[in-house]
UniProtKB/Swiss-Prot annotation:
Belongs to the glycosyl hydrolase 13 family. Removes maltotriose and maltotetraose chains that are attached by 1,6-alpha-linkage to the limit dextrin main chain, generating a debranched limit dextrin. Gene3D superfamilies: Glycosidases (3.20.20.80), Golgi alpha-mannosidase II (2.60.40.1180), Immunoglobulins (2.60.40.10). GO terms for biological process: glycogen catabolic process. It catalyses: Hydrolysis of (1->6)-alpha-D-glucosidic linkages to branches with degrees of polymerization of three or four glucose residues in limit dextrin. Pathway: Glycan degradation; glycogen degradation. Its EC number is 3.2.1.196. Residues 460-479 are annotated as: Disordered. This is Glycogen debranching enzyme. It comes from the Bacteria. The keyword Hydrolase applies. Keywords: Carbohydrate metabolism, Glycogen metabolism, Glycosidase, Hydrolase. GO terms for molecular function: glycogen debranching enzyme activity; hydrolase activity, hydrolyzing O-glycosyl compounds.
Length: 657
């Protein structure tokens, strides 16, 4: 190969122009950067990057082609106390690599050293980057742009969703291709889903600790290459990008948006004892929040924290997000531990990354969802994100469970959460859709486990059941575990119905965990991040068709209720909502705080949710008018009820007049 030309300092990463490849890498503190390319025989060829524009190192390799494997060796000081951990003996991944060849195994050679550098060369076993071409024929693809008020989110894992689906071809189960298969798309459409939210698809690594136990990181919240698709979800790693885009194109044709769960808060390099893959060896002090002693601020619980207040790291994160939108046509993002995005180090609404997103004509137009906390002091920021963001509403989750499973929540608190938690989100011009309401998520009990287990059962995770939260607000209804008498099964079913109804008929944006509509159980494991097995894969052969139909009917009912889809805050007297007691009268102040758990919610003056969350059968006097129960609480032809509904214990019903 010829020598490197100077090339251009932008864009970041490796880009093929038809004649060769331009390489760029950011590093403030590097003293020298070597581009290492590998031929078909694995022979390494090294080139110093000749260009150095500001903090960007760059060079152009004529005649280089897509498929070229490469990495970097970065020279600089080894000064751990100052936060510098350069080690040119270690081959490093380009942070903007679009494809990775090789596996991130637990190997001592993939570590830089702790106090002293490990100068053993690792190029023979280190994963390599691959130059790719982004071109793709999108045909007439267009984003669905579903209004927030009409959005129904379905949180799913690429593999877990389809790996056991009997109607999907065996060879594509558990892959990106399966997401775009007609069977899966038809299912999502029939259910009423408008947005498929995928757990992380950017390439991730399994922690060495898990590998030593024979486990793996299943969820994917351990990123190593944020621009590259995780190859294990592809039928062929070389075609992963096209397989993913094929699926998105098919979902878009069906009117379904795709939202990516993205991890912009830490990397798979973990703590100082963790592996060296990329950022730590490129510019540790710039990419991460570093303490005065040279160690990491661990505001994520994962060993390190990305410094998203550094201008270059903001540019990197912004470029990553734009890549997924522009190259893959994704419709939005859910940001894991998103409080990190606003750290300066204190949390600010005008933090640099938030400002960059706000000012970006691409990113400001997609759906943005925050998990609004991290584990550091001041990390709980629910309701405090900039107006462009919606946020996971843990207030809703806890209130719904407490009301239906613990019976210890006043009506006033329940109603506040039902009304999109306006006390939290009605500020800065935000709409009710800013509240992402959920009862369950990937992290925690499944819906079925909420009604079958009082305690977590995480022994399979190898941490002696110490991991996972103990604050589940669950209720096993008298017996720990699945199964039981017919009466027990029916009481659990009623609780599931109540929780689903609360989720899907409340104001705000509902998010349904994949499998909850099946009755999927993880057998009490509320932290199944390392369980890539039948514990987490959805078993479609065991899915409850009745529960699926119930869920679909609720979603389609929601779409008929103007008060829920118009995305306007409810105001007294506007006809959107009336809160009534069991006698169809407005609730008194005392009833709101101390009254029995009986409530009628009249929506759009036509739809009535009658709730009896007590343990006794109770007569509920309906408002004036001719009412009939509607699906999924009754068939299509139902007798008119003009006066009283016999509310079963711990039950609810929806009527229309």
């Amino acid at each position: 190969m010829t020598q490197l030309a100077i090339g251009k300092p932008a864009p970041l990463g490796a880009h093929y122009d038809g004649q060769g490849v331009n390489f760029t890498l950011f590093s403030v503190h590097a003293e020298r950067v070597e581009l290492c390319v590998f031929d078909a025989n694995g022979q390494e060829h090294r080139y110093d990057l000749p260009g150095h524009s500001g903090d960007i190192w760059h060079g152009y390799l004529p005649d280089a082609r897509p498929g070229l494997r490469y990495g970097y060796r970065v020279h600089g000081p080894w000064q751990p106390a100052e936060g510098h951990r350069f080690n040119p003996a270690k081959l490093l991944i380009d942070p903007c690599a679009r494809q990775i060849d090789g596996e991130f195994k637990d190997n001592p050679l993939l570590h830089a050293g702790h106090n002293e550098p490990d100068y053993r060369d690792n190029a023979a076993i280190a994963p390599k980057c691959v130059v790719v071409v982004d071109h793709y024929d999108w045909e007439d693809d267009a984003p669905p742009r579903t209004p927030w008020g009409s959005t129904i989110i379905y949180e799913a894992h690429v593999k877990g969703l389809t790996y056991l689906h009997p109607e999907i071809p065996v060879e594509i189960r558990g892959t990106y291709k399966a997401l775009g298969h007609p069977v899966m798309i038809n299912y999502l459409k029939q259910l009423g889903i408008t947005a498929l939210e995928l757990l992380p698809v950017a390439q991730f690594a399994s922690e060495p600790r898990l590998q030593r136990m024979g486990l793996s990181n299943y969820w994917g919240y351990n990123p190593v290459a944020m621009f590259a698709l995780h190859p294990a979800y592809a039928c062929s790693p070389e075609t992963a990008l096209d397989e993913f885009r094929d699926a998105i194109k098919a979902l878009h044709k069906a009117g379904i948006e795709v939202i990516l769960d993205i991890v912009l808060n830490h990397s798979a390099e973990l703590d100082l004892d963790g592996p060296l893959f990329s950022l730590r060896g490129i510019d540790n002090r710039s990419y991460y929040w570093i303490r005065e002693d040279g160690d990491y601020h661990n505001w994520t619980g994962c060993g390190n924290t990305l410094n998203l207040s550094h201008p270059a790291v903001v540019d990197y994160a912004s470029a990553c997000l734009r890549y997924w939108v522009e190259t893959c046509h994704v419709d939005g993002f859910r940001f894991d531990l998103a409080a990190v995005m606003g750290r300066t180090p204190e949390f600010r609404q005008d933090a640099p990354l938030f400002t960059a997103i706000q000012n970006c004509p691409v990113l400001s137009q997609v759906k943005l969802i925050a998990e609004p906390w991290d584990i550091a002091p001041g990390g709980y920021q629910v309701g405090n994100f900039p107006p462009l963001f919606a946020e996971w509403n843990d207030h809703f989750r806890d209130a719904a469970r407490r009301f239906w499973l613990h019976y210890d929540l006043p009506l006033g608190a329940f109603a506040g959460r039902f009304a999109a938690s306006s006390d939290v989100f009605k500020r800065n011009g935000r709409l009710p859709s800013a509240a992402i309401n959920l009862v369950t998520a990937h992290d925690g009990f499944t819906l079925r486990d909420c009604v079958c287990f009082n305690h977590k059962h995480n022994e399979a995770n190898g941490e002696e059941n110490r991991d996972g939260t103990n604050n589940n607000y669950s209720n096993n209804h008298g017996k720990e575990g699945l199964g039981g008498t017919l009466d027990l099964v029916e009481r659990r079913r009623d609780s599931i119905h109540a929780l689903l109804t609360t989720l899907l008929l409340s104001q705000g944006t509902p998010m349904l965990l994949a499998g909850d509509e099946h009755g999927h159980s993880q057998h009490g494991n509320n932290n199944a991040y390392c369980q890539d097995n039948q514990l987490t894969w959805l078993d479609w052969s065991q899915a409850s068709s009745g529960l699926t139909a119930f869920t679909a009917a609720l979603i389609h009912l929601r779409k008929r209720i103007p008060a829920l889809v118009e995305n306007r805050w409810w105001e007294e007297g506007d006809g959107n909502v009336r809160w009534l007691n069991r006698y169809a009268q407005p609730l008194s102040t005392d009833e709101w705080q101390n009254g029995p758990k009986q409530l009628q919610i009249l929506l759009s003056d036509r739809f009535l949710i009658a709730i009896n969350a007590t343990l006794e059968v109770t007569e509920i006097v309906l408002p004036a008018g001719e009412w009939h129960a509607i699906p999924p609480f009754a068939g299509e032809d139902n007798p008119v009820i003009t006066a009283v509904w016999q509310g079963p214990a711990h039950g609810l019903c929806v009527f229309q007049r």
